Amino acid sequence: MANMKDVKRRIKSVESTMQITKAMQLVASSKMRKAKERAEAVHPFFEGVFQVMADISRDHEFTSVFTKKKFKNSVLLIVIAGDRGLAGGFNTNVLKLAKAKADAITESGGEAVIMAIGKKAVEYFEKREYKLIDGFPQIAEGIELIDAMMIANKVIERFKIGDFDAVELVYTTFVSVMTQEPQHLRILPVENLEYLGQKHPMTIYDPSPEEVFDSLIPEYMGGMLYSAIVDSFASEQAARRTAMESASDNANEMIEKLSLLYNRARQAQITQEITEISSASLNDNS
């Protein structure tokens, strides 16, 4: 027979844990909504930047250091993960993709260089034999556009002097509250812009299309990084919300089972006491 005091203590412990998981679920939901709002707020500006760059890149005579394809001797992987755990497979999935991309670069004879954004990404690559050149833990929740621009300018300067032949991004994109998908994309050299928007043949760029294009690269890079970091943060919160919702449901199910166990133990105890009283009464009468 289960010890009633132990079962009661266990029920209280699980109830306390469920209060925590429900609170974390609510906090994650709130942070997820705010992150989505931040991403949507800057979208029109960056859409305009991309459209101008796309318009310039359609000119067959146009050339820029930021569009020239090179042999990929050295590739910078900017890896964005979370700052905390308790988010299901969020961190594991994006870091698994990043590792696969880094290993593929190495196996093809190139060098994979890592820039990690998020505490989990920094910790992951610090513990492994990868070339980690920079780390930015715990910046995602409060990141401003100026922070993303600062990181972007660091990358741009090193790309211009030839430290990297390509810059690629690994992060998690928000599909829905229930679905978040790890993504990999090339951001430098810039490619495939010619497929965006409409051609504007009467547009004249001063001082030159090349200079205008190159001057927009910091906004382009900053926008890509800012959007990816905010998107990743929203994905992290969605994954945490789902994980905490599942934990709360499991805790509630456990409480129901423990309560049933407690009630059965209590019923058995009462039955035993009645039996003992009845037996004592019969003995007295005899």
From Swiss-Prot:
Q: Which domain of life is it from?
A: Bacteria
Query: What GO biological process terms are annotated to this protein in UniProt?
Result: proton motive force-driven plasma membrane ATP synthesis
Main localization of the protein?
membrane
- Keyword annotations from UniProtKB, A to Z: ATP synthesis, Cell membrane, CF(1), Hydrogen ion transport, Ion transport, Membrane, Transport
Q: Report the InterPro entries cross-referenced here.
A: ATP_synth_F1_ATPase_gsu (IPR035968), ATP_synth_F1_gsu (IPR000131)
Q: What subcellular locations does the record give?
A: Cell membrane
**CDD domains listed in its UniProt record:** F1-ATPase_gamma
User: What GO molecular function annotations does the UniProt record carry, in alphabetical order?
Assistant: ATP binding; proton-transporting ATP synthase activity, rotational mechanism
GO cellular component assignments: plasma membrane; proton-transporting ATP synthase complex
Q: Does the keyword Disulfide bond apply?
A: no
Pfam families given for it?
ATP-synt
Membrane topology per the entry is: Peripheral membrane protein
As for family, the record states: Belongs to the ATPase gamma chain family.
Q: State how it assembles.
A: F-type ATPases have 2 components, CF(1) - the catalytic core - and CF(0) - the membrane proton channel. CF(1) has five subunits: alpha(3), beta(3), gamma(1), delta(1), epsilon(1). CF(0) has three main subunits: a, b and c.
Its biological purpose: Produces ATP from ADP in the presence of a proton gradient across the membrane. The gamma chain is believed to be important in regulating ATPase activity and the flow of protons through the CF(0) complex.
The record's annotation in NCBIfam families points to: ATPsyn_F1gamma
Stated name of the protein: ATP synthase gamma chain
Gene name per UniProt: atpG
